[in-house]
Amino acid sequence: VLCVMKSLNLDLSNADKVFRTYSLKEGRNEEFNLNKPCIINLIKNPTGANEVMKEINSHEEDKMICIFLNDNDQDGHDISWIWDAHFERLNQKNIREIVCSGLRAYDMALRLKYEGLEDKIKVIEDCVKAVHYLNEANMNSYIMCTYTALHATRAILRKEEK
């Protein structure tokens, strides 16, 4: 950006202002302060889910994962994309538990079972109870959720936030 601005003889201070005030969009590595940090990310296709899992795995601390999977109109009713995402990436020693929640929690749990994660899976269909469970675990946590789960989950996280 700076190179282009410089080549066009534009004022570089404008870029500085933008960089200093830029904030990520909702559900893009958004952090909430529960008993421990909780990061939420939107997933809506295999590529997005794979990138989020790569980011999660870049953090070496012990952690919990929660996946909220819905199939409302805005999400798209076809959730077959979960079979194309590389959920085997969650088969890590430092991932202690994976909570499956949302309207299609059991579909997500089945998908994870096929990756050999059955000992780490806990299904909590109710989103409020799932977030409360994460908070009580007192461990860094990462939430991956589909579009319609994102707004509801963010609202729950705001209420739980310290």
Segments the model singles out, each with a brief description of its role:
Residues 1, 98, 143:
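Residue-level signal for inorganic ion chemistry
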Residues 1-8, 49-52:
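Buried hydrophobic packing segments
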Residues 4-43:
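Gly/charged, well-structured mid-domain segments that form the phosphate/adenylate-handling core
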Residues 8-11, 58-62, 134-141:
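Glycine-rich phosphate-binding loop signature in dinucleotide/nucleotide-binding domains
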Residues 21, 26-28, 48-51, 127-131:
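A short, well-structured juxtamembrane/interface segment
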Residues 25, 36-37, 42-119, 123, ...:
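Active-site beta-alpha connecting loops in nucleotide-dependent enzymes
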Residues 106-162:
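Generic C-terminus detector
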